[in-house]
């Protein structure tokens, strides 16, 4: 089973690359962002809570996110593997994911970290806001999300570096070049 986490700051292109990876390797795509946006669009109680938190540029609790992931994994039994997109975001989430996968005998094969300079990330996110109208793509929320990423999320990379499954990919180039670098990394970890 091929379990991979796609990692990087907001606006790095994780969603774009995830679609291509899922298609090529036939993995179940577990995107916390998609799951949360679905809850918001459907107007569920969880969605209303999430919408308020996200609009403030804050990150949802580990418990909230882990519950979404566990429910989704349970719905995808018998797949070739999972592509985790937007998860784990904290070391606590990484440790929970490690335990969940090890319990199944299928540990995480790689954390693929997409690197893009801050100014390019900001430009991408503001452009995306014009197109998609996402509430979390305004200047104030963007700045807060980057602080959160730098304060908490970047420690996840260190967690997986210690395990020897962290892979860096340059993301400030055309989509196909990024995908080729990711594909090469996946082939080496299989």
Where is each model-derived feature located?
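Glycine-rich phosphate-binding loop of ATP-dependent small-molecule kinases
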Residues: 1-190
